[in-house]
């Protein structure tokens, strides 16, 4: 019986810590005069190690991944690095692999944009760094690190492929995809 109580207490503590971590993502994100609402958030884990937490912010929350990918409207994905094991090269490599998955192996169609992405993500990555990938209609995907603009990549097609890393039918993490589409900040 005490073993069960210990497990329940550990789970309760974990739930509180996870709730607090997601609270750091914030329930909304202000872009200019527009306010985006947190659609859902989750954690990317690999081999039992939490790599980052990510939140999807939309003007009008929805669970329809295809509608989100196709939408030519303001939206954002926020990624907060939670592991000290993430480096610049591993982040870039992971995004490239995710783009290959998202595009069904047709990432070479976005060679120029991927080259731009590598140049934009030039700074080393540290634990607690926050990346915002903000899509602005007619202006492209703006990439911010810790609130500072790093660069932008033009095109709705690239936004679809990039957001597809998390939201396509072949995402980097199916549980994370489900969490980002859940309408809940905590899974």
Walk through the language-model features, giving the residues of each.
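Bacterial N-terminal signal peptides that target proteins for export
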Residues: 1-8
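Bacterial N-terminal signal peptides
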Residues: 9-16
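Terminal leader/tail segments of proteins
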Residues: 21-187
């Amino acid at each position: 019986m005490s073993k069960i109580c210990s497990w329940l207490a550990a789970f309760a503590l974990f739930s509180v810590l996870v709730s607090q971590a997601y609270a750091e993502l914030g329930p909304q994100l202000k872009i200019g005069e527009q306010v985006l609402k947190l659609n859902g958030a989750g954690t990317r884990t690999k081999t039992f190690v939490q790599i980052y937490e990510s939140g999807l912010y939309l003007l009008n929350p929805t669970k329809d991944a295809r509608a989100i990918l196709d939408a030519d409207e303001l939206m954002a994905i926020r990624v907060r690095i939670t592991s000290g094991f993430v480096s610049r090269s591993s982040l870039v490599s992971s995004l490239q692999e995710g783009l290959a998955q998202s595009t069904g192996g047709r990432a070479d169609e976005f060679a120029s944009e991927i080259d731009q992405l590598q140049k934009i993500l030039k700074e080393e990555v540290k634990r607690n760094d926050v990346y915002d990938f903000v899509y602005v209609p007619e202006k492209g995907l703006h990439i911010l690190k810790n609130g500072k603009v790093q660069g932008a990549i033009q095109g709705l097609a690239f936004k679809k492929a990039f957001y597809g890393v998390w939201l396509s039918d072949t995402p980097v993490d199916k549980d994370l995809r489900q969490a980002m589409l859940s309408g809940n900040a905590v899974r």
